[in-house]
């Protein structure tokens, strides 16, 4: 299979899976294994296509991101979504990521650990659906600092490969009495700084594996993941309010079984 086709397929996988509660890591490892695209070059490629998905969110939520630069609501102590909400949502995962980055990359990016993450994340999502209570926050401006911090703490679970950032944060939001749409949007916003930091750190360590010959392949993957991520996020927000997290949880369990059959056995 040509590099361009491989890039196109993996770009679609990344764009679909990055911001959905189904684990982009698990999908990329499984599909990469089936395509025979593995090793350091593959890891560097995954970093690049993640940047495409990140850019999609940055564009979709550019107005909200720009508004976070306005510190007046924060200084006036207005009950309005502001940069401190994002800080509370980001800080726990940043600390966890910095402390555990090398351990995670060395020991946890293994097929069997990803299977554990897929199943554990599915259990959390089902638990959140069963235990969720009537929402008190129906928009980002309703979000309290306590709710933001709670979701931020749940984001720490996503440092474990296969757990899913969206799955853990949306579950945390439901348990903190935040509705689906608001939990999802906050999940996307707090994912940006964490992903930019983690991806940037990985890219600094991996850029030596790149060559000029890789540019066409990496460009196709980047553009594909960007376009697909934009479409996936818009569709997901509409779908989630209708079907909830359980179908995604069941899909994760199915993926864990497929992962075990095709990768581990």
From Swiss-Prot:
It comes from Bacillus thuringiensis subsp. konkukian (strain 97-27). It comes from the Bacteria. InterPro entries: UppP. Keywords: Antibiotic resistance, Cell membrane, Cell shape, Cell wall biogenesis/degradation, Hydrolase, Membrane, Peptidoglycan synthesis, Transmembrane, Transmembrane helix. Catalyzes the dephosphorylation of undecaprenyl diphosphate (UPP). Confers resistance to bacitracin. It catalyses: di-trans,octa-cis-undecaprenyl diphosphate + H2O = di-trans,octa-cis-undecaprenyl phosphate + phosphate + H(+). The chain crosses the membrane at residues 4-24, 42-62, 84-104, 108-128, 184-204, 217-237, 245-265. HAMAP family: Undec_diphosphatase. One of its GO terms (biological process) is cell wall organization. Its EC number is 3.6.1.27. It is found in: Cell membrane. Belongs to the UppP family. It holds the Pfam family BacA. GO terms for cellular component: plasma membrane. This is Undecaprenyl-diphosphatase 1. Bacitracin is thought to be involved in the inhibition of peptidoglycan synthesis by sequestering undecaprenyl diphosphate, thereby reducing the pool of lipid carrier available. PANTHER family: UNDECAPRENYL-DIPHOSPHATASE. Disulfide bonds: none annotated. It is a multi-pass membrane protein. One of its GO terms (molecular function) is undecaprenyl-diphosphatase activity.
